[in-house]
Amino acid sequence: MARRQYPKGEELAKSFLNKLKNYPNFEIISQSDVCHIRIDNNEYFLYFKCVTHEGKPYPLERQRAQLPKRESFEAIKKSIVPFLFIGYDVDNDVYICWEPSKVKPRLNKKTYVSFYSRLSIQRNVVEGEIKVTIALYRYHA
């Protein structure tokens, strides 16, 4: 069985930012492995990664995206600009964003830091609605 190919961060960023381009108060400040944007005079750093099953057998209820260690994250850690880690569920065409105040302190803590989401919630998203869900997971820093 061939291994599934997931879109890379650059492709995910392009697709996401393309959806925002017609918003009147939207600006791309810079775009590399991390996007730096401004919306309504508020700045954000964005990093994109696909959400996949946690392990085998799959699909499991718990999905995850892994945030890698990156040199570019060092300056972001020191910045006051919020960092948004945005996962994309290819199968359900849904974006997941983890709480910035929980993500930013974990930047570059390990080679990869995992963030989890629930498949059942992703499957039940209704187009045009923003669903806010808080799920508590234990993690090892």
Q: What is the meaning of each model-derived region?
A:
Residues 1-141:
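Intrinsically disordered, charged low-complexity linkers and terminal tails
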